[in-house]
């Protein structure tokens, strides 16, 4: 989805904050660029059960497959694993008085959500992801 003013470096998408603001909705910008969190149970994909591939709303990077999605009851779309491990980055997050693992898009560094070690098999992980960070490409 890069436009003429978008730079890519080693598969990274680099845009100015002005470009991001123009291209993303206000909630997408807040989540992806400012690390905001949607209110629980408010996101577009929380109860969406269509088959497909979830890509980054900022850059189109493939992130999760619908067959890895499960209902965790936490209020955000949850997945057991990324579609491609190298398409997500994880960083330690000590904001808000908590210690968590933040999940970011490896291509555009957009904030996606957090991963927790309380999910079902096969991984035991729960990738708790903001709907605003995702775009579903139905199969």
UniProtKB/Swiss-Prot annotation:
Record-linked Pfam families = SelR
One BP term from GO:
response to oxidative stress
Positions of the MsrB domain: 17-139
UniProt keyword Nucleotidyltransferase present: no
Return the InterPro entries for the record: Met_Sox_Rdtase_MsrB, Met_Sox_Rdtase_MsrB_dom, Mss4-like_sf
Keywords assigned? Metal-binding, Oxidoreductase, Zinc
The Swiss-Prot or TrEMBL record lists the needed cofactor(s) as:
Zn(2+)
Entry's family note: Belongs to the MsrB Met sulfoxide reductase family.
> What is the protein's name according to its record?
Peptide methionine sulfoxide reductase MsrB
| Species per Swiss-Prot/TrEMBL record | Bradyrhizobium diazoefficiens (strain JCM 10833 / BCRC 13528 / IAM 13628 / NBRC 14792 / USDA 110)
Instruction: Write the gene name.
Output: msrB
